[in-house]
Structures are given as structure tokens and as C-alpha cells.
Design a protein with these regions (language model features):
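Hydrophobic anchor residue at the start of the ABC signature
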Residues: 40
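ABC ATPase "signature
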Residues: 110-111
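Catalytic Walker B motif of ABC-type/P-loop ATPase nucleotide-binding domains
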Residues: 51-54
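Conserved ABC ATPase "signature" region
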Residues: 2-22
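Conserved catalytic motifs of ABC-family nucleotide-binding domains
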Residues: 47
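Conserved ABC ATPase signature
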Residues: 26-30
Length: 147
């Protein structure tokens, strides 16, 4: 007996992450980026109300990354709550309605991307046209993303 009494359309899940052509492949035979996308498809089984994604675009080429960003937006617009961890500030700023910045395991700031930029980006912003979340991270933590 299954835990959930729902049919899962694996074709649809694989299609969402652009892996339909790999439907017969064993996970160990997939590239790193394909394995990453496969793990997202697995996380979508049974349509969770909350989706946890840990560094979901690590190892993805630029096209696959943007395709996954589109999927995350689509899922969120359909009402799914998504908790995303990332070191990619562009990704956080692009996908997240709210951002929590952690430093050494402590929450140092949490707000909308725009409010974080308004409150914490250095003046004048280091970005050519406006401040960004990376400027905020640097201002709040005092170190770069890889320090």
C-alpha cells in the first residue's frame, strides 16, 4: 500500500525539468546537472504544499538554470511555498519574495529584496545602476560569498 493514494504522472514531472528524453536512463548515468534536475522532479512527486530546494541550480548550464527558475516561478504562482537556499545572489533576488541572510548560522536580516537593498546597500550602490542583494550581503556580513 502506498502512503498517498495518488497517481504520479512521471512523464509530466520529467517534462517539467526537461528530462523526458532520459526517462529510461538510470539516475547514475545522468550528468551532474541532469541529476540535479531529476532531484527537483522527485521533490515534486505528490505535489507538496511546501517545496524545499537546496542550491537547486548548482551544476546547471545557463539555459537549464533559467528553465529551472521559470519552473520555480510557475510553481510559486500556482500557490506552492518554496524555501530556497542559495549562494547565488542573482538567483535569490530574481526568485524570492522574501530573503533571509544568514551569517555563521545566525539570521542577520530578513525582508523583501527591495527593502533589504534600500536599508542595507552601501551608498552609492556598488552596482552600476542600483544596489543588489550581493551588496546587502557584503554590508551585513563583512565578507564575500566564499569567505
Amino acid at each position: 500500500a502506498a502512503l498517498y493514494n495518488r497517481e504520479v504522472d512521471t512523464t509530466e514531472l520529467l517534462s517539467k525539468v526537461n528530462l523526458l528524453d532520459k526517462a529510461q536512463a538510470r539516475p547514475g548515468n545522468l550528468s551532474g546537472g541532469q541529476q540535479q534536475r531529476f532531484s527537483v522532479a522527485c521533490a515534486l512527486v505528490n505535489s507538496p504544499k511546501i517545496l524545499f530546494l537546496d542550491e537547486p541550480t548548482t551544476g546547471l548550464d545557463p539555459q537549464a538554470k533559467h528553465n529551472l527558475w521559470d519552473l520555480v516561478r510557475e510553481l510559486n504562482e500556482a500557490g506552492m511555498t518554496i524555501v530556497l537556499t542559495t549562494h547565488n545572489m542573482e538567483e535569490a533576488e530574481s526568485l524570492c519574495k522574501r530573503i533571509a541572510i544568514m551569517d555563521h548560522g545566525k539570521l542577520v536580516a530578513e525582508d523583501t529584496p527591495q527593502n533589504l537593498i534600500l536599508k542595507h546597500a552601501p551608498e552609492p550602490p556598488q552596482a552600476p545602476l542600483h544596489g543588489n542583494i550581493e551588496d546587502v550581503f557584503l554590508a551585513l556580513t563583512g565578507h564575500g560569498l566564499r569567505d
